[in-house]
Structure formats: C-alpha cells, structure tokens
C-alpha cells in the first residue's frame, strides 16, 4: 500500500485476521499511516456490505444430511446403555453420566457436520458468512437453527436430562417446546436482572483502582516473576506469547555455546520474542504485583501500553483502564445470553469418528497399554503419538495420528460403522467449562421383594439383588361379644405358581391365622385341598420363567448352579439364553425353575442399612455423585465477584477459603523465613491463584484480557497487612497499613514492626485508601468522616476523585507533576 512491493493476502479476512493486519501495520508503519489504512478498510467494508445486501431466508438454513444417521447411532448407544443398567452391569450414576455424554457427543459432532456441510456446499451462504465472520455471534446460537438444540439448563443452571433433538427449522413438538421454555425464561431473567450486577462490578473495580497511576520510571524492586520457556502445543505457545510481550526483562541471558546475548537487562520483550522461545531457559520479568511504590506503579513494572505497543507514559491512568477492561466484557456478554436461550454447553473431549464402514487396525504392542476407563470399559490408552488406520477396502483407507493420552475404544481388526466414535483425545491444558457439585441421588426399588447382597462371590461383587415378592396385609376388625361365637380353623393358602399340566398338585402351603374375635355372621369360603387351580396354558405370571425339558439326552442346565444361586442374563448356555437376571428356585433332573430378580449395582463404600423385606419404591441407598451445572457468563460473573470480593464462606472449607489458605501459608513460611519474606511468599501464591481462576472464567467465554489489568486489581487486594506488634512505631496493634510503607519504615527501626498478610475484597480495599475524601464518595460516608476527624487525618490529594471533587487539575496526562 505504501511501498513498491505490493503484498497480496489470498485468504478470507475475518475479525481476527483484520486485527492481526492492523497490529502488523502499526508496528511497521506507525500511527499516521495506520489511521489512513483504517479509514480505507472502513470505507471498503461499508460499500461492499451495502452492495452485498446479506440477509437470512429459510432456504439458507441447511440441515446436514448426516443428522439422521447420527441420531440413529446415538439411540443405539442409549439402548445398549439401558440394557446394561437393567442387567445390573452399571449403576444409576454411571447410566446418567453415559446418557449425558452420548447426547453431548452427538451435539458436538452435529455442530461440526453443520459447518462442514455449509463449507463444502455453499461458501456464500448468509448464515455461514455471518457466523464465521468473528463478530459477537456464536456458533452455539446458530446451531439451534440447523442442527439441534441439545440439552437445556433451567434458570438455576441445572441440567435437564431430556434433550431437544430437533432444530427451529424442523420445529419442536409440545414436550420439546415446554422444555425450551425453561431456557427462554432464563435468558430473559438474566438480561433484565443480571446486567445491573455486571455494571455494579465495574463501578467497584473503578473505585478500587482509580488512584493507580504511573508515577515513576523505576522502583528498583528486587522482586521478579519467573517464567519457564517450555511449550508443546499451539495453545501453550499462545499463552507464553501473551505473558511475555510488552514485559520488561530483569536478567541478562546469554547462549551457552558462544556467550551471545539472547536478551539483556531492562530490555522490553517485543515481537522478536521467537528467538527467546527457541531456547529452553527461564525468563525473569517485572509485573505490577512486584512494584514496591507506596502509591501507583512504575513504568518498568507495567511495561508496554497495550494500545500503542510502546513503554507506558508517566501519568497514565492504568487503574481505570484495567477496571474498564475487566468490567466491559461482562456487561456485553450478560446481554448476549438472551440469544443462547439456556442451552447447556459442555466442553467434551474431541471425538474421532469413523469416516466410513470398514475395519480398524493399529499395533497393540507400541506406544500405549490396555486399561479400563472410569466406566470399567476396556480401552487402549496411548502414551505417545499413535497411528490408526481404517480400511473400507483395499483402495480406500483413512489414517489418523492420535496425540498422547488418547482413548481408543475398538480393538484391532474389529468392524466399525460410519460416524461411530472410535477414539477420544484428551487435552490436559483445557479446563472444564461446567462447574461440578456434589448431589445426593436416591436410588429406589421399582419392585417389592426380598433383598440379598452376595459379598463372597467376586463375580457378583457390588450387586444388590431384589427378589420379586408380594406383600399380603390382613385387615384387623373387632366386635363386642353379644352372641354365641363359633370358632373355625381359618387359613390363607398360597398356591404354587408353576405346576405341571393335567396333574394333581402336591399339598399347598397353608398359613394358619390366629384370630381371637370373629363375628358369627361373617362370610365363609370353602376350598378343597389338592384341587387343580392353575394350568400353564391359561395363566402365566410375567415375572416368572419356566423351562421345560427338551427331548435330548444332553443336560441344558449347567450343574454348577444350585438352588438359591443368582445368574445374570445370557448365562445358562449359548443356545438357550436366559432372558432376565434370575434366581434358581427349583432344580429337577432335566429342568430348572427360575425366578426373575432385579439387580442394582452399588457404588463403593455404600453402607447397607435396609430391612430384609422391601416394599416397592422403598429407598435402597443414597449415592453422592458429581452433577454438572451450566457455567455461562452469568454464573461466571458470580464467581468473578466472589474472587474479587474475597468472600468468606459460612462453612469453612480450607481447600477453598482464600483467607484460611493465606493464614496457613504464612504460618508455614514464617518457620523458614523472616516476617517480610514469608508475607510476600504467601501473598504471591494467593495472587497467582486468583489470576488463574479469573482468567479461566473469561477464556471459557472466548474473552482475552491481558494479565496486567487483572494484576493491578489483585495488587489493590493484597497490598495491605495487619499489624501484630508495633515495635518502635506509632502504629496501633490491629491497624491495617500498606506493606511497602511498613517495609520502608522497618529500615529505620531497631525493633521492627511485626505484621501478617490479609486479603481485602475490592469494596474493603476502596475503604482503606489513603484519601478519606475518596472513601466518603463510595460507601459509609459518615463513618469515614468521623474516623478521619478523630484521627486528624490529612488528605494529600494523590488520586483522581479527591482532586475532581475539590475542582483541582487531576494528576494524570498533562496534569501529572
């Protein structure tokens, strides 16, 4: 554009590509020429957008042809899982997890197929163009139109088990529409109520960091952050790049062979960072968390101004910029959730599907081992990159290279069908998008009967059997004796359910009932003993199975099964399958009579305290399971607020309570180091944890925020300490002060000030600023004024708010002194 050598970019330019182009142009040609380029891009884009007249019609919504096949495969898998559950091979918890994973896999694969279908058949499709342009729209919104809505979450973020298999073009049936209303309600509630929460978070962030300004060139801190240069994937490379670019190096590093300087002390790491990444070394950089100025940050600790790509200037309001950078995406994405309609999004492992029906082959002896997954299924776990080949015939074949830590579900030589999941790849760097919480599941018996647990037989380990039985209850009645009473022998006869045809039955089982008072006029029923009651051809209870003898000499029943033993489905012979899990109740010469039972597989460490005889729908046991909860930006903002406010939970959980963790860390470090070092080391770990947690929430929503912005807010939260021993100073025990101020004072005192680190939320840190004028403009105005008057405080007018209120020139930019 500005040189004789014209550069051609033969590719589609979406939002990311345009961003990279402008960034590259700014570095090479400067601000003025970049401004002219932006004007030309804007004019070019608007002219062509007007001429194109892009809009969506019903014909643009193209449903992928492979959807029908994917639905059939998912239904087959669900039927297999259901059979395993009914036969007691898997428990209820595993059944629910596998059911959800089946729909997740189908939803994800259908989304990929939808994009692939549009890409192959209609590149100029309006929907495809808008979706992949890089605008705020998301593929999860578009897939509802052309693939399937999938699993839905209610207004609390809880998962509903029944998925919506149709899309909006096909139309929803009455049940699917009813489920869909849950999500629609969630979207409306979030948009109307939660937007205010996102705005209030921004306000608190602004108040916490408004006085953070670039005040000096260098603070000469001895503290630094160590970064190890090591990456394997593109994602790790990208994270290293974001971490390093624009930072100041604090240690000269040379090559081992020729002492050539790779990077020198005080040098800012620019876009030539690739030469650093070629060496397996450790880089030491300055961060805002390491700055030891009592107010504000120095240029060396902050590094580049990300807007210009140059060292930040003195008087720059980096605190306000940081607060806006963190708060703005939350406000925007809160309003975006309305379009998602409550669909449950879950990051699953990447599945490898078979491209056609054929046979699979790979070497079992190399780069992996046979093992079992958490569902007790046989898999092959790869330790290194693994080659697998799928043959349709001698000519057509497909080759895949699986990364380490992948699961292969099929064995070599096994037949695979088109779109069947043959393997899953696992990325250790990815964090789960959905939060998990413990849920107690109640497992109830669907029949009445007798319980039995076989603890000796390993084959039936963890199986809980319920034998079919009916409860017989007798009604009690009484009457005062006024007349003569006749006593007769009364019994309740239980006839045999299974008897041979056309033969007299043996004596039936009789239960004698002892009745003290029976009315004289009660109804009488007579029955003869040994009378034929049941004929096989006439009545057959559905829960009973009878096996008749075959006209063969060979025995059908395996003799190892004795009366009372349990047998699973398909476990008698190969020719004659047992249709249901059963118990042998009668053994004859050539036949066995089986009774249908219902097996339940128990989880480990479940205590059995149930009665011997159980009624239908009686509680068998309770199992604790991990249940997923949809984690969109609404739930994300709640988590971000908890971290920034450093809230204490009512139930003290030391693994999650940051205040307790900080206290424990300080106690442990205090045994090895002095007071100042142990405080800074314990604070450093908490700072790292908060930074990683906040970044993970935003990155799950596709938002990139520079670590610098979050570090500035975290510095405000962790820069205070509480005094435990005042030493020679005029401070009072329990007073909260800045750690850098105390360290400067300790240099002059013989009896040092002893202190402990504390963690303040953004609201509290705003109330502990040096300026009392700033405090009264935020919260607790009367309290702050009275406290300032009693303590005879002086406001030195360092920040923005205090100068603004008094009508002074604010100390930033040209007003900075």
UniProtKB/Swiss-Prot annotation:
Q: What cystine linkages occur within this chain? A: none
UniProt GO BP: DNA-templated transcription
Which reactions appear under catalytic activity for this entry? RNA(n) + a ribonucleoside 5'-triphosphate = RNA(n+1) + diphosphate
Residues the entry annotates as binding Zn(2+)? 219, 291, 298, 301
Keyword Zinc attached: yes
Q: Which SUPFAM superfamilies match?
A: beta and beta-prime subunits of DNA dependent RNA-polymerase
Just give the chief location class: plastid
Which GO CC annotations does the UniProt entry carry? DNA-directed RNA polymerase complex; mitochondrion; plastid
For this protein, the Enzyme Commission number is 2.7.7.6
Explain how, and how many, cofactor molecules are bound. Binds 1 Zn(2+) ion per subunit.
Q: Which cell locations does it reside in?
A: Plastid
GO MF term list: DNA binding; DNA-directed RNA polymerase activity; metal ion binding
Query: What cofactors are annotated for this protein?
Result: Zn(2+)
Q: Cross-referenced CDD domains, in alphabetical order? A: RNAP_beta'_C
Is this entry keyworded Zinc?
yes
Q: Which UniProt keywords are listed?
A: DNA-directed RNA polymerase, Metal-binding, Nucleotidyltransferase, Plastid, Transcription, Transferase, Zinc
Alphabetized InterPro entries for the sequence: DNA-dir_RpoC_beta_prime, RNA_pol_Rpb1_3_sf, RNA_pol_Rpb1_4, RNA_pol_Rpb1_5, Rpb1_funnel_sf
Q: Which family does it belong to?
A: Belongs to the RNA polymerase beta' chain family. RpoC2 subfamily.
> What does the annotation say about its assembly with partners?
In plastids the minimal PEP RNA polymerase catalytic core is composed of four subunits: alpha, beta, beta', and beta''. When a (nuclear-encoded) sigma factor is associated with the core the holoenzyme is formed, which can initiate transcription.
Entry function: DNA-dependent RNA polymerase catalyzes the transcription of DNA into RNA using the four ribonucleoside triphosphates as substrates.
* Name of protein: DNA-directed RNA polymerase subunit beta''
The organism of origin for this protein: Euglena longa
Q: What is the lineage of its organism?
A: Eukaryota, Discoba, Euglenozoa, Euglenida, Spirocuta
